[in-house]
Amino acid sequence: MRNFDITSAETLDGYARKIGFLPFFKNSIRGFSVEEMCPPSLWFTDRPGPWEWKGPVIRKGNCAYGKFFKNKAVYVSLEMLPHLCNYRRDGYDFDARCDDGLVFYRDKDVYDIIAQSGGIISKDVRQKINDKDIDKYFTRLQMQTYIVTSDFVYEKSKDGRTYGWGVAKYATPESLYGAELIRSQYKTKPSESFEIMVERILKYFPETDRQTVIKLIK
């Protein structure tokens, strides 16, 4: 996993599905990131690279994308996503979490806008909720798996060319992948889902200390 094996959106998608999880940036597990698996020559060029591949990979529909590990971006295969949701949600759909008083009110405001829209760019949410801490709410909802990044939207010039950094578009995982899939592991104990995720990563990075994996995904 330490070779420069990711050279396109297709190979990125393939590795994310194979491993089950693929962080975008370097982390505590050596070699376990797009940053390390993609040649330096493909970053920040005039041609599409890892930054620009995010949208196409998400749109393929094989992987979810969001800030899932330590508030950092990760691709998660649809095979592993139900286990991540089961573990992070700990038996709570969002409404149930609200009923038990476990949700910050601003998180609920953000979630409701995203859920009701079916998919909305972050800039539009910012306009509806004027709060300097809104990025914190986006991140917390992603870490809890109640929202995911559904695409990246780019500005276009008069001649139709895209430019600048892509703006994240958010949706609920249920609206993107279906509630049946997302909740398919709800009968599994969250601790069992966690163990399945740990073992999956160790399968591909066996030299990694188990505790390191636990700390990364906990």
Give residue ranges: language-model regions.
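Long, low-complexity intrinsically disordered regions
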Residues: 1-218
